């Protein structure tokens, strides 16, 4: 819990109350889940959310990437270097990602794009064995045998604790490039902040900018 209207600010934790003249909000974001059957049970057993982190564990195997934006397309391209087959599954009939990325992924022989399709269920007991698919246009159901499912459908900011305390936009904290929010003395850094690009390098930059702003504020 946070009490930002007072001075000093109060950060209430399970270990006690922390008093501070300034607070930096940097709680990050987590991958958005599909919310389908067996997704959470098989996480780490074939279900993954980071191709660059886990892709090498699927060398020579067949995998599916779910999504249609830049991240999904880049994940499919990355995995094509390790996997024998990559199925790129998108619920629409065209990608949202950059045209240059689309052309590259379409040219790779071991990537197959499956359009207008959603994943309804991930099948397997101890590990991923297959996925159940539904074509949204034809209502045709099918099952695809894969050993891995990489989910790339966006991220969700961890900002519930800040709701109502600072101005927000679709769950993200509205903050300037120097990290300043709508509340004096409160700053935001990393994936919680409104910005066009969310990567490790931009999060690190945000942290440096926010701390510099705190120093100036104090």
What annotation goes with each model-predicted range?
Residues 72-73:
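N-terminal Rossmann-fold NAD(P) dinucleotide-binding loop
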Residues 30, 35, 40-57, 151-202, ...:
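FAD-site-proximal beta/loop scaffold in flavoenzymes
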Residues 15, 59-61, 116, 183:
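Phosphate-coordination loops involved in phosphoryl transfer and adenosine-cofactor binding
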Residues 25, 49, 113-115, 145, ...:
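A structural signal for the hydrophobic beta-strands that form the central parallel beta-sheet
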Residues 1-12, 17-20, 81-177, 216-218:
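A Rossmann-like FAD-binding core segment of flavoenzymes
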Residues 67-69:
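Glycine-rich Rossmann-fold phosphate-binding loop(s) that bind the pyrophosphate
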Residues 76-77:
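Generic hydrophobic/aromatic pocket-lining and core-packing "Φ" positions
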Residues 13, 25-26, 65, 151:
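Redox-cofactor binding/interface segments in oxidoreductases and associated redox assembly factors
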């Amino acid at each position: 819990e946070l009490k930002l209207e007072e001075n000093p600010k109060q950060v209430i934790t399970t270990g006690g109350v922390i008093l501070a003249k300034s607070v930096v909000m940097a709680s990050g974001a987590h991958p958005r889940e599909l919310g389908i059957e067996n997704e959470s049970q098989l996480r780490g057993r074939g279900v993954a959310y980071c191709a660059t982190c886990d892709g090498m564990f699927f060398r020579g195997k067949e995998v599916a990437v779910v999504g249609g934006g830049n991240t999904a397309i880049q994940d499919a391209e990355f995995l094509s270097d390790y996997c024998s087959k990559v199925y790129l599954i998108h619920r629409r009939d065209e990608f949202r990602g950059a045209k240059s990325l689309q052309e590259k992924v379409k040219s790779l022989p071991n990537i197959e794009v499956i359009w207008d399709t959603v994943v309804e269920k991930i099948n397997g007991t101890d590990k991923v064995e297959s996925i159940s698919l539904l074509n949204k246009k034809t209502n045709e159901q099918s099952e695809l045998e894969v050993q891995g499912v990489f989910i790339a459908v966006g991220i969700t900011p961890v900002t519930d604790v800040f709701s109502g305390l600072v101005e927000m936009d679709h769950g993200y904290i509205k903050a300037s490039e120097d990290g300043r929010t709508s509340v004096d003395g409160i700053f935001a850094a990393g994936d919680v902040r409104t910005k066009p690009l969310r990567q490790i390098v931009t999060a690190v930059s945000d942290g440096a900018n926010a701390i510099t702003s705190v120093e100036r504020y104090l």
